[in-house]
């Protein structure tokens, strides 16, 4: 399957060994969450459609991925699933859910979006538009510190 706005492929090296780069995976998860969600197949190389036939995913790897993505992102929801391909090789199908109410970001403050087959940083005007398009939290209905307005300082109410 070709990479597009809903699908991406990552090498298993992205999440294992000395070459693991969870930061890049986190950026892709943020980009998918800010778009309409998507799927990242981890363990399938860019030039392949199947994993290596001998590839086996360890039982702890999906949990490790969830833990690291949760540490590196805000407002990103993911669900990993280990899939056995036709050739017997295994890979992880990482479902990234769309962030419908809030804006997803990395813990470094990067806001990204999926654009065709790539993830890119949002420009300020795009971020403003994305924020205004999302239904926001209704702060007016939030009770702050459980203090009723009748206990407010009357002098401050009249100024």
Identify the function of each model-found stretch:
Residues 1-159:
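Conserved N-terminal catalytic/coupling substructures associated with nucleotide/phosphate chemistry
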């Amino acid at each position: 399957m070709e990479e597009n706005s809903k699908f991406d492929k990552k090498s298993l090296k992205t999440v294992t060994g000395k070459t693991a780069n969870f930061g890049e995976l986190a950026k892709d998860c943020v980009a998918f969450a800010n778009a309409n969600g998507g799927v990242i197949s981890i363990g399938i190389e860019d030039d392949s459609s199947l994993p290596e036939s001998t590839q086996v995913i360890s039982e702890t790897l999906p949990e490790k991925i969830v833990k690291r993505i949760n540490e590196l992102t805000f407002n990103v929801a993911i669900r990993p699933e280990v899939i056995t391909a036709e050739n017997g090789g295994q890979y992880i199908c990482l479902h990234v859910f769309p962030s419908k109410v809030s804006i997803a970001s990395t813990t470094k403050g990067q806001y990204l979006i999926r654009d065709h087959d790539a993830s890119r940083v949002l420009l300020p005007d795009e971020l403003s538009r994305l924020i205004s398009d999302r239904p926001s939290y209704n702060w007016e209905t939030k009770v702050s510190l459980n203090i009723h307005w009748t206990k407010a300082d009357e002098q401050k109410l009249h100024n």
